[in-house]
């Protein structure tokens, strides 16, 4: 074999040998050491080809090119006559990647970061990249206060030049803050300043926000909080001079020292606005008014800038620039604020597009828009469209993106990006209580039928005491102006005695039609007509029931077990809704008020009216809306007209998952008081507790609920982040702690006539319960679990601590 002459060795592992400036002509190229990399692929990555004249520089470029592929650990190029011999050592191939000891960082996140760096199964192992990843992960742990953490890559060789890569984590413990010192503060105590920090050196048990575990990011946020605290109180020259963070020798403790210069308090002497105001100087002037002698306030200055931007944004100036420059006068301790405004170009909307609505038709979304195509861009109108889409309840998230049109100086496209949720639900409910046992209900509801926006529902109940069926359809846009049209058909066969209610049977059917009229963005009115037929039978003689029958001109017998009565009623139905919730499902901010009522009209057998008012208010207590306080109320009242009473079967009831949890459904409130009758199979001593006056059985009280013509229910709820749930599912699961209270009463009950019996006209007989609830927007529909313990109840009340329902949320 001819003697091989070394041309150039690896740039990393050996020095270059100059062969000659004149070079030589390459007749052939051979490779040694290739295993996984194909010869053709290696040749394509080289700048040298057969027939080329090469010199030292060409060889250097060849080695660089081969190294740049990332496939080789070592590259040597030698000459054998006119043949170029390339000796390579391939990097090993990664056969598997595993992790050990990582608790703070999930495997999926690690895999994503590794893949972003080109480290994945089947690729070559780059030890330099692995070293960078080790350092990056350790830096991450240091940033969250885990200074004893270490990350080591363990590479295990395998046959055929393969390796197993294992990242071994030793996370250690988070360093806890031992002390936070603020040096230079005179106007405020250190405790007062630290009380606004997230990081604390002491955290009382009730503080769910404070944290002793050091995190670099949280410290940066706390320093900004400190700066804002002073700037908001007039200290215009406040400065954070330095911050020292020192570790204890065992790396488990942190001492933080913040050196500040407070300076003096300054007052605003005036605001001067200049620049391109786009003809809105008067409106901008209103936004920049200040009170004489008002302290300089950094937050108010920022808000003023934002308000000016929002104002201009409403008129199509999508990208205004607003810059405030404080002019400080140290002599008289005043600040003059100079505000420079550049409105920029006015933009018009070329197109409004929707993304992510795979089920919902574009027209369903487009009709909720307040921003029009071809008109100037109004930021408030774009936001209104987002709010309206959220309130539909069809989408889990709604985001907006304003995109400039390429090549156009004054046009944009507005894109609404939605993530659809399952708007259909299979409504299945189950409850269990010591007295009630197990109860069921079922139904199907689709709020966005075939993507048209129609709400279609088929609901039914079949159990020991009820057979109920209902078909409902609502078109929210019966007209282009947003007038809605809804209709309903129903049938109900109700055996009250089997439902622990007052004994009677009611077979009813009916229909109603309702029109809805939008008043403005948040208010709407409803009006409609209804018809219902009631066929009552098996009415046991009971005081409230007989009182109603007497008012209707009936004279039922207390000795007859089969009293019957039929009515046909026509009603005028009305309603009003105010809805300013931020979302249709799982809202976190805003209020909703719903008033519904009905009154009989001429041609009806009954004469009565009935009104119900529901309210709900959500108040977020953090910026991310993860901690929310919810207050709900329900008020109901009804009464007869023209000397008649409201039918007993229209009474209000309370108890159950939608009113007062922890109590069996519909069992709160007045109980039946029966008249003893003469039937041979009737035994009042067995069936009821009867009062005896002058040796006669006069009245018998029971635990059978009869409801009342008045109701009041309230609930206070504290919504919290759900433990062990990732951010991905945060919008689908909700956990809350609640306190429910409610009562039902009968304003027509005359307690003076029924001494020895509870006063069912007293509204102060309030029931209370407390517990925890979990709601989940599952593929079947909304699932609601609750466990409640009644802590204020009365004789005859029936507890049902655990309740489970599919198809109902609040």
Swiss-Prot record:
<feature type="transmembrane region" description="Beta stranded; Name=Strand 16">
    <location>
        <begin position="804"/>
        <end position="808"/>
    </location>
</feature>
<dbReference type="GO" id="GO:0016020">
    <property type="term" value="C:membrane"/>
</dbReference>
<feature type="transmembrane region" description="Beta stranded; Name=Strand 12">
    <location>
        <begin position="709"/>
        <end position="718"/>
    </location>
</feature>
<feature type="signal peptide">
    <location>
        <begin position="1"/>
        <end position="20"/>
    </location>
</feature>
<feature type="topological domain" description="Periplasmic">
    <location>
        <begin position="507"/>
        <end position="522"/>
    </location>
</feature>
<dbReference type="InterPro" id="IPR023707">
    <property type="entry name" value="OM_assembly_BamA"/>
</dbReference>
<feature type="domain" description="POTRA 4">
    <location>
        <begin position="266"/>
        <end position="344"/>
    </location>
</feature>
<feature type="transmembrane region" description="Beta stranded; Name=Strand 15">
    <location>
        <begin position="779"/>
        <end position="789"/>
    </location>
</feature>
<comment type="function">
    <text>(Microbial infection) Acts as a receptor for CdiA-EC93, the contact-dependent growth inhibition (CDI) effector of E.coli strain EC93; antibodies against extracellular epitopes decrease CDI. Its role in CDI is independent of the other Bam complex components. Is not the receptor for CdiA from E.coli strain 536 / UPEC, which does not have the same mode of toxicity as CdiA from strain EC93; the decreased expression of bamA101 in some experiments decreases the level of outer membrane proteins in general.</text>
</comment>
<feature type="domain" description="POTRA 1">
    <location>
        <begin position="24"/>
        <end position="91"/>
    </location>
</feature>
<feature type="topological domain" description="Periplasmic">
    <location>
        <begin position="578"/>
        <end position="590"/>
    </location>
</feature>
<comment type="subunit">
    <text>Part of the Bam complex, which is composed of the outer membrane protein BamA, and four lipoproteins BamB, BamC, BamD and BamE. BamA interacts directly with BamB and the BamCDE subcomplex. The Bam complex has the shape of a hat, with the BamA beta-barrel crown in the outer membrane and the periplasmic brim formed by the BamA POTRA domains and the 4 lipoproteins.</text>
</comment>
<feature type="domain" description="POTRA 2">
    <location>
        <begin position="92"/>
        <end position="172"/>
    </location>
</feature>
<feature type="topological domain" description="Periplasmic">
    <location>
        <begin position="620"/>
        <end position="628"/>
    </location>
</feature>
<feature type="transmembrane region" description="Beta stranded; Name=Strand 8">
    <location>
        <begin position="564"/>
        <end position="577"/>
    </location>
</feature>
<feature type="topological domain" description="Extracellular; loop 2">
    <location>
        <begin position="463"/>
        <end position="465"/>
    </location>
</feature>
<feature type="domain" description="POTRA 3">
    <location>
        <begin position="175"/>
        <end position="263"/>
    </location>
</feature>
<feature type="transmembrane region" description="Beta stranded; Name=Strand 14">
    <location>
        <begin position="768"/>
        <end position="777"/>
    </location>
</feature>
<feature type="topological domain" description="Periplasmic">
    <location>
        <position position="778"/>
    </location>
</feature>
<feature type="transmembrane region" description="Beta stranded; Name=Strand 10">
    <location>
        <begin position="609"/>
        <end position="619"/>
    </location>
</feature>
<feature type="topological domain" description="Extracellular; loop 1">
    <location>
        <begin position="434"/>
        <end position="435"/>
    </location>
</feature>
<feature type="topological domain" description="Extracellular; loop 8">
    <location>
        <begin position="790"/>
        <end position="803"/>
    </location>
</feature>
<feature type="transmembrane region" description="Beta stranded; Name=Strand 7">
    <location>
        <begin position="523"/>
        <end position="535"/>
    </location>
</feature>
<dbReference type="InterPro" id="IPR000184">
    <property type="entry name" value="Bac_surfAg_D15"/>
</dbReference>
<comment type="similarity">
    <text>Belongs to the BamA family.</text>
</comment>
<feature type="topological domain" description="Extracellular; loop 6">
    <location>
        <begin position="640"/>
        <end position="708"/>
    </location>
</feature>
<comment type="function">
    <text>Part of the outer membrane protein assembly complex (Bam), which is involved in assembly and insertion of beta-barrel proteins into the outer membrane. Constitutes, with BamD, the core component of the assembly machinery. Efficient substrate folding and insertion into the outer membrane requires all 5 subunits. A lateral gate may open between the first and last strands of the BamA beta-barrel that allows substrate to insert into the outer membrane; comparison of the structures of complete and nearly complete Bam complexes show there is considerable movement of all 5 proteins.</text>
</comment>
<feature type="topological domain" description="Extracellular; loop 5">
    <location>
        <begin position="601"/>
        <end position="608"/>
    </location>
</feature>
<keyword id="KW-0998">Cell outer membrane</keyword>
<keyword id="KW-0130">Cell adhesion</keyword>
<keyword id="KW-1134">Transmembrane beta strand</keyword>
<feature type="topological domain" description="Periplasmic">
    <location>
        <begin position="447"/>
        <end position="454"/>
    </location>
</feature>
<feature type="transmembrane region" description="Beta stranded; Name=Strand 9">
    <location>
        <begin position="591"/>
        <end position="600"/>
    </location>
</feature>
<dbReference type="Pfam" id="PF01103">
    <property type="entry name" value="Omp85"/>
</dbReference>
<dbReference type="Pfam" id="PF07244">
    <property type="entry name" value="POTRA"/>
</dbReference>
<dbReference type="GO" id="GO:0043165">
    <property type="term" value="P:Gram-negative-bacterium-type cell outer membrane assembly"/>
</dbReference>
<keyword id="KW-0812">Transmembrane</keyword>
<feature type="transmembrane region" description="Beta stranded; Name=Strand 5">
    <location>
        <begin position="484"/>
        <end position="495"/>
    </location>
</feature>
<feature type="topological domain" description="Periplasmic">
    <location>
        <begin position="476"/>
        <end position="483"/>
    </location>
</feature>
<feature type="topological domain" description="Periplasmic">
    <location>
        <begin position="21"/>
        <end position="424"/>
    </location>
</feature>
<protein>
    <recommendedName>
        <fullName>Outer membrane protein assembly factor BamA</fullName>
    </recommendedName>
</protein>
<feature type="transmembrane region" description="Beta stranded; Name=Strand 11">
    <location>
        <begin position="629"/>
        <end position="639"/>
    </location>
</feature>
């Amino acid at each position: 074999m001819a003697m091989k002459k070394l041309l150039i060795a690896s740039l990393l592992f050996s020095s270059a040998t100059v062969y000659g400036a004149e070079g030589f002509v390459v007749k052939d190229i051979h490779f040694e050491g290739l295993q996984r990399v194909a010869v053709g692929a290696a040749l394509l990555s080289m700048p040298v080809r057969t027939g080329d004249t090469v010199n030292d520089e060409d060889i250097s470029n060849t080695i660089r090119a081969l190294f740049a592929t990332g496939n080789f650990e070592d590259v040597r190029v030698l000459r054998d006559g006119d043949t170029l011999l390339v000796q390579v050592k391939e990097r090993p191939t990664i056969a598997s990647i595993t992790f050990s000891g990582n608790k703070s960082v999930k495997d999926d996140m690690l895999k994503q970061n590794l893949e972003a760096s080109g480290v994945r199964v089947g690729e070559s192992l780059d030890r330099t990249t692995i070293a960078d990843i080790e350092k990056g992960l350790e830096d991450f742990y240091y940033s969250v206060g885990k200074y004893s953490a270490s990350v080591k890559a363990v590479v295990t060789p395998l046959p055929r030049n393969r390796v197993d890569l294992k990242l071994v984590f030793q996370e250690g413990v988070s360093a806890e803050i031992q002390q936070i010192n603020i040096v230079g503060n005179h106007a405020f105590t250190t405790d007062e300043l630290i009380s606004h920090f997230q990081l604390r050196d002491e955290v009382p048990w009730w503080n769910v926000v404070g944290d002793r575990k050091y995190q670099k990011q949280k410290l940066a946020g706390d320093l900004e909080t400190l700066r804002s605290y002073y700037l908001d109180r007039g200290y215009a020259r406040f400065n954070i001079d330095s911050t020292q963070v020192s570790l204890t020798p065992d790396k488990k403790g942190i001492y933080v020292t913040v050196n500040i210069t407070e300076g003096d308090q300054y007052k605003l002497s005036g605001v001067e606005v200049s620049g391109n105001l786009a003809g809105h100087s008067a409106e901008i002037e209103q936004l920049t008014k200040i009170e004489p002698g008002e302290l300089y306030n950094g937050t108010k200055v920022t808000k003023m800038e934002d308000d000016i931007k929002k104002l201009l944004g409403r008129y199509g100036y999508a990208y205004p620039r607003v810059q405030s420059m404080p002019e400080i006068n140290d002599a008289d301790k005043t600040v003059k604020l100079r505000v420079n405004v550049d409105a920029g170009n006015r933009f018009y909307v070329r197109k409004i597009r929707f993304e992510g609505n795979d089920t919902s038709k574009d027209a369903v979304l487009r009709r909720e828009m307040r921003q029009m195509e071809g008109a100037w861009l109004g930021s408030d109108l774009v936001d209104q469209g987002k709010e309206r889409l959220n309130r539909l309840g069809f989408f889990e998230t709604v985001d907006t993106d304003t995109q400039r049109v390429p090549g156009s100086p004054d046009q944009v496209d507005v894109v609404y990006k939605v993530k659809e949720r399952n708007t259909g639900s299979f409504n299945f409910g189950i409850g269990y209580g010591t007295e009630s046992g197990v109860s069921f209900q079922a139904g199907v509801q689709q709020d966005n039928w075939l993507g048209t926006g129609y709400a279609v529902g088929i609901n039914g109940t079949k159990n020991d005491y009820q057979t109920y069926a209902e078909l409902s359809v609502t078109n929210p846009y019966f007209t282009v102006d947003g007038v809605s049209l809804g209709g309903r058909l129903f049938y109900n066969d109700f055996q009250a005695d089997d439902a622990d209610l007052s004994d009677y049977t009611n077979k009813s059917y009916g229909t109603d039609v309702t029109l809805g009229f939008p008043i403005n963005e948040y208010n709407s009115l409803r009006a409609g007509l209804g018809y219902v037929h009631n066929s009552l039978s098996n009415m046991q003689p009971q005081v409230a029931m007989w009182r109603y029958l007497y008012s209707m001109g009936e004279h039922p017998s207390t000795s007859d077990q089969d009293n019957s009565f039929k009515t046909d009623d026509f009603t005028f139905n009305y309603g009003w809704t105010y809805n300013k919730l931020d979302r249709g499902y799982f809202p976190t901010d805003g209020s909703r008020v719903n008033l519904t009522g009905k009154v009989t009209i001429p041609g009806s057998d009954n004469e009565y009216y009935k009104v119900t008012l529901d309210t709900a208010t959500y108040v977020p207590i953090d910026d991310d809306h993860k901690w929310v306080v919810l207050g709900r109320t329900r008020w109901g009242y009804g009464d007869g007209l023209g000397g008649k009473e409201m039918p007993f079967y229209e009474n209000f009831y309370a108890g159950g998952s939608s009113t007062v949890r922890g109590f069996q459904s519909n069992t709160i409130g007045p109980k039946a008081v029966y008249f003893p009758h003469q039937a041979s199979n009737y035994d009042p001593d067995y069936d009821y507790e009867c009062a005896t006056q002058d040796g006669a059985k006069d009245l018998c009280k029971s635990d059978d609920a009869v409801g009342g013509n008045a109701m009041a229910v309230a609930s206070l709820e504290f919504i919290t982040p759900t433990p062990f749930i990732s951010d991905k599912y945060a919008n689908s699961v909700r956990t809350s702690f609640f306190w429910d209270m409610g009562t039902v009463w009968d304003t027509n009950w005359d307690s003076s006539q029924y001494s020895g019996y509870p006063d069912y006209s007293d509204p102060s007989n309030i029931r209370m319960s407390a517990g925890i609830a979990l709601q989940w927007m599952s593929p079947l529909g909304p699932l609601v679990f609750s466990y409640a313990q009644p802590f204020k109840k009365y004789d005859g009340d029936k507890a049902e601590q655990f309740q489970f329902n599919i198809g109902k949320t609040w």
